[in-house]
Amino acid sequence: MSKVRNSDIRSELRPSAQLLKLTYTAASETAFEKFDRQCIKKYRGKWKSRNTVAEEKAIVRSDGSILRILVVRCEDGEEENATGLLWLHDGGYAYGVPEQESLLVDMFCGDGSCVAVLPDYTKSIEAPYPAALEDCYSVL
């Protein structure tokens, strides 16, 4: 993985990037890969919610590969005209899985007024930008 120079970062994002560098001093590709494996082991396939259910589905990407997504609904069913929500899980596009967001998504979908779609997008450690963004857009 090549080193990201300050000039590679959009000027308005540079202050946040500097803060992240201080926060994640050990943010190497190896560290992100290790943390991603831990997230997958701990969360993948385990939707921990009191009010919602997650159904795993697959979307075929333009290159023929499969994009895993979760469709989250209220456990008791949803209203007929529920709001749609595209939820991108935490992890800075570098690590994590949709299932780690169950508590937060519960707040939006638990009463049946919202249905959320959570893509298990391509991580930046697997493919460079805009791979994750393209995955998320393809869900729409």
Task: Mark where each language-model region is.
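A glycine/proline-hinged amphipathic helix-loop "lid/cap" segment
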Residues: 1-74
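Short beta-strand element of the alpha/beta-hydrolase
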Residues: 81-91
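Short beta-to-alpha linker loops that shape the active-site pocket of alpha/beta-hydrolase fold enzymes
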Residues: 91, 120-124
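Conserved catalytic-core motifs of eukaryotic protein kinase domains, centered on the activation segment
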Residues: 97-99, 128-129
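Short amphipathic alpha-helix adjacent to the substrate-entry channel of hydrolases
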Residues: 99-118, 134
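Alpha/beta-hydrolase active-site loop
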Residues: 127-140
